[in-house]
Amino acid sequence: MGISMILDNFLYLGAAKDTKDEKEMEKLKITHIFSCAGTVHSPEKYIIANEKFEDDETVDISEQIEKAYWFIERVRMKKGARVFIHCMAGKSRSASIVLSYLLKRDIHSLSDCLFYLHSKRLEIRPNDGFMNQLCDLELKLTNKQTLSKEIKEWRSLQSKALKTKIDVQTCHFIQPSLDSTKKANEQYLLHIQSISFTFFEIHLNQDKIIQLYQQQCQLLHSNNIDIKYFTSILQEELSNSTKKAFDFLLIHYYLDWQDIINNLLNYTNLKLNLN
C-alpha cells in the first residue's frame, strides 16, 4: 500500500514498515513523524512524537488527538516541513488521528473527512470505538453529527468506498482555504503563547533571563547581543537546568526550546538590547 499523501506536500499517512523505505521517506522530504505504534526506523533522522496506543475500541484517544493536532500544526508552521502519521498498518489508529486533524483543522463534517480520506487511502478502517469518539468530537466542534453512532453509519460508507472508485477530483474541498489557514495560524500562536507563559513561571522567570543577559554582556564586553546567540544561551540553560522542563514540553504537545524562546522574546516586556 505504501505511503499516502493526504494534504499536498505536507501530511502523509502510512504504516510503521514504511519508515524502513529510506529512499521513499527522503523523496517525500519527511521531517516529522507522529507514531501511534512506537516503531520508527532510523529515528535519528526525524523529529518524532511517539504516542503509542492500542488499536482497541475501549481506548480513549482524546489526549492523542489533542497532542497530534498541535504537533501537526507546529510542523505546518515550519517552512518546508512535512509530517508522516503512522501506526502498524496505516488503517485504524493513524487514520483516526488524521481524521481528527482534518476535522479540527477546518471544521469540515466527519462524513466529508472520511470520504476524503478514503479517496486518498482506500483501505483505512478506524475501529468503531475510535469512530464513536470522532463523532463526539464533531458534535463538540459543529453541534451536529453527520454519521450515526447507533447504526455505525461509517461502515456503510467504508463498504461503498471499497466497491466504488472514488473520484479524487470531487474531494478538493478538504484542502485548507486561505482564510482557514490564517485563522489556524492565529490559534497556533495563541496556543504557544499560553503554554510559554506557564513555562516561564515554572522554569525560566524574568529575573533569571535578565541575569543571563547581563552575564553575556559582560563576557562579550558589549551592550548589544545577537538574538540567535542569546537564544542558544537560553536553550543551553534550559537543557542543563532540569529534566522537568523537558518533560513539560513533551506533555504540552511536543514544543521545543525554540518555540518557547521565540515566544519569550516576542511577547515579554523585557528591555533587552537584541539585534
From Swiss-Prot:
The Enzyme Commission number assigned here is: 3.1.3.16, 3.1.3.48
Q: Which terms does the record give in the GO molecular function aspect?
A: phosphoprotein phosphatase activity; protein serine/threonine phosphatase activity; protein tyrosine phosphatase activity
Give the UniProt keywords, A-Z. Hydrolase, Protein phosphatase
A GO CC term attached to the entry: cytoplasm
Q: Which domain of life is it from?
A: Eukaryota
Residues annotated as domain Tyrosine-protein phosphatase: 2-143
Q: Which GO terms describe its biological process?
A: negative regulation of MAPK cascade; signal transduction
Known catalytic reactions? O-phospho-L-tyrosyl-[protein] + H2O = L-tyrosyl-[protein] + phosphate; O-phospho-L-seryl-[protein] + H2O = L-seryl-[protein] + phosphate; O-phospho-L-threonyl-[protein] + H2O = L-threonyl-[protein] + phosphate
SUPFAM superfamilies linked to this entry: (Phosphotyrosine protein) phosphatases II (SSF52799)
Pfam families listed in its UniProt record? DSPc
The record's CDD domains line, in alphabetical order, gives:
DSP
Catalytic residues (positions) = C87
Family, similarity comment? Belongs to the protein-tyrosine phosphatase family. Non-receptor class dual specificity subfamily.
What the protein does comes down to: Has a dual specificity toward Ser/Thr and Tyr-containing proteins.
* Cross-referenced PANTHER family: DUAL SPECIFICITY PROTEIN PHOSPHATASE, DUAL SPECIFICITY PROTEIN PHOSPHATASE DDB_G0271350-RELATED
Task: Please report the name of this protein according to its UniProt entry.
Answer: Probable dual specificity protein phosphatase DDB_G0271350
Q: Source species, please? A: Dictyostelium discoideum (Social amoeba)
